[in-house]
């Protein structure tokens, strides 16, 4: 009789402490503690994030194991985010994973955070509509720290076709939200306001970058200069037009993302297209995916909202596949704040 494989996944790359347990690749539990402390600072404060991870990691892991209905001694391996991310945050998860695995005498599995996002569609949470994309497929990975188009041939065979040469789409949204005085994180706020606004009300600069690479620094600069000019003319401009501003900003960013993705589909002839990362929760981007599916015959794969942001389930599913291939890491494996994709 084949022994069941239980993987504990741990994610701590930024400001979410998360732990998940998977049994034979099926998700049993996924527990996440988010950090509201950063909101008043307008962004993640690394030192505060690290301290919060230290407070949260033990109870979060214990709760994940409890909800999974197993004993820790049943675990087969511990998978953890090795990078990229904030070094102080990563070290908390990395060191806990090492100590926990060593105490149980089980293997360690290091996981690239970006690889985890790419594999989010392979998280089987027991849903009736579980439908992972067939290989190969294209994945738009878009978050606060990354904007990439990835060709996925297998969990351990991915090719970056294009990526941002400066700022990420999620970072641009957060910075523009801050300029408007809307608070942090900006993504959900811009998304909510955009649903009530006119996406063609204002025009912002779009980059002209060859190939499949992205750039969002010019958009941020254009947005800032326009806001300054309009506020000088009318101090209440943002308050009176925030819905239209948000809708126009969202439309511009989505348009930039989709133009490059459409080009990638044309170049590769791959029409199975997925989206992942925190920005994939954006309503405008999701609508654009459905629209392109109808217009161009794509088959699109959009993750559950709970799998769009940082979570340990995505680390656990990569860990499961690596366990099957016996791809374990050494106890001395360091964390990396910056790391190549795979």
How would you describe each model-predicted region?
Residues 115, 153-198, 221, 225-229:
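Glycine-rich phosphate-binding loop plus the immediately following alpha-helix
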Residues 1-3, 111-137, 318:
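Conserved phosphate-binding catalytic cores of ATP/NTP-utilizing and phosphoryl-transfer enzymes
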Residues 192-273, 282-296, 323-326:
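A contiguous, well-structured pocket-lining segment that forms one wall/lid of small-molecule binding clefts
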Residues 110-111, 243, 273, 290-315:
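Conserved phosphate-binding/catalytic loops in two-lobed NTP-binding clefts
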Residues 4-84, 113:
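N-terminal beta-alpha supersecondary unit
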Residues 117-119, 303-342:
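Glycine-rich phosphate-binding/hydrolytic loop that grips phosphoryl groups
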Residues 80-105, 123-124, 283-292:
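Short Gly/Thr/Asp-enriched flexible loops that form oxyanion-binding sites at enzyme active sites
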Residues 17-22, 139, 147-151:
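Short beta-strand scaffold segments in enzyme catalytic cores
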């Amino acid at each position: 009789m084949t022994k069941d494989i239980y993987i504990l996944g741990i994610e701590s790359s930024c400001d979410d402490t998360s732990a998940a347990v998977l049994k034979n690749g099926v998700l049993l539990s996924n527990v996440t503690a988010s950090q509201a402390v950063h909101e008043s600072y307008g962004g993640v404060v690394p030192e505060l994030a690290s301290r919060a991870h230290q407070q949260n990691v033990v109870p979060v892991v214990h709760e994940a194991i409890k909800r999974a209905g197993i004993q820790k001694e049943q675990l087969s391996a511990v998978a953890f985010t090795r990078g990229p991310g904030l070094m102080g945050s990563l070290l908390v998860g990395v060191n806990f994973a090492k100590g926990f695995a060593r105490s149980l005498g089980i293997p360690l599995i290091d996981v690239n955070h970006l690889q985890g996002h790419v594999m989010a569609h392979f998280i089987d949470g027991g849903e009736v509509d579980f439908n992972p994309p067939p290989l190969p497929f294209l994945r738009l990975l878009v978050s606060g720290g990354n904007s990439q188009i990835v060709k996925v041939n297998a969990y351990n065979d991915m090719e970056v076709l294009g990526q941002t040469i400066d700022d990420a789409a999620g970072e641009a949204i957060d910075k523009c939200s801050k300029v408007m005085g809307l608070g942090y994180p900006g993504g959900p706020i811009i998304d909510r306001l955009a649903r009530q606004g006119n996406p063609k009300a204002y025009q912002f600069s779009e980059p002209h970058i060859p190939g499949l690479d992205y750039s969002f620094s010019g958009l941020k600069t254009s947005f800032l200069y326009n806001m300054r000019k309009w506020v000088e003319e009318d101090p209440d401009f943002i308050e009176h037009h925030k819905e239209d501003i948000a809708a126009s900003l969202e439309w511009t960013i989505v348009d930039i993302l989709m133009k490059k993705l459409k080009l990638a589909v044309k170049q590769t002839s791959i029409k199975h297209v997925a989206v992942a990362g925190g920005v994939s929760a954006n309503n405008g981007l999701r609508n654009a995916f459905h629209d392109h599916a109808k217009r161009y015959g794509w088959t699109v794969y959009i993750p559950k909202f709970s799998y769009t942001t940082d979570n340990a389930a995505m680390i656990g599913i990569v860990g499961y596949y690596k366990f099957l291939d016996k791809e374990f890491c050494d106890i001395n494996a360091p964390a990396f704040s910056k790391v190549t994709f795979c």
